């Protein structure tokens, strides 16, 4: 449908998109095989879950066919553990570099300011770590404390200050 109607951009906004290898490969192969030369597909991915086969396929794609958003959030190991995420930073770094070296895929990496255990010094390190990967775009977001979320439950322990109304920053 999207390809037939030449929709300019389609976004897959599930950061676990590439957790299931066969699922991600099937979608990426389909997109590559049915490329209309116009539509761009935006994928949120966990870069450390990419493997050689996925990276080879991505590197074969037409420039502009897909773009990757990689939610690093922080490189502070205490912060990553506390927000209940996993990330192997060296694999992220390696995979971002392998994709970048081909030059056909736009990559943007995300950081979030205001996370637990992140102070100005550790945030500066996270920024420097991500900046050193030379993404096409470095996106900075602010922690959003949503009603009913783990962060809201832990607001006193983390001494979080935020708005109770959208955008909850």
Where is each model-derived feature located?
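Conserved SAM/AdoMet-binding glycine-rich loop
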Residues: 1-109, 113-115
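Flexible glycine/acidic-rich beta-alpha junction loops that bind and position SAM and/or redox cofactors
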Residues: 21-22, 72, 78-83, 113-121, ...
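Short, hinge-like loop/turn segments at secondary-structure boundaries
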Residues: 28-29, 126, 155-158
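Catalytic cores of alpha/beta
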Residues: 53-58, 116-134
């Amino acid at each position: 449908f999207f390809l037939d109607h030449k929709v300019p951009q389609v976004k897959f906004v599930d950061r676990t998109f590439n957790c299931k290898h066969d699922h991600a490969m099937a979608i990426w192969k389909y997109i590559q095989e049915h490329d209309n030369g116009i539509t761009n597909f935006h994928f949120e991915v966990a870069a450390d879950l990419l493997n050689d086969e996925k990276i080879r396929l991505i590197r074969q794609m037409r420039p502009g066919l897909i773009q990757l958003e990689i939610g690093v959030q922080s490189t502070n190991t205490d912060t990553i553990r506390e927000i209940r995420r996993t990330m192997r930073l060296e694999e992220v770094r390696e995979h971002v570099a392998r994709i970048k070296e081909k030059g056909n895929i736009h990559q943007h990496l995300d950081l979030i300011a205001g996370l637990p255990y992140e102070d100005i010094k550790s945030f500066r390190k996270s920024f420097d770590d991500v900046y050193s990967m030379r993404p096409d775009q470095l996106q900075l977001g602010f922690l959003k404390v949503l009603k009913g979320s783990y962060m809201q439950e832990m607001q006193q322990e983390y001494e979080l200050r935020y708005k109770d109304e959208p955008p909850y920053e």
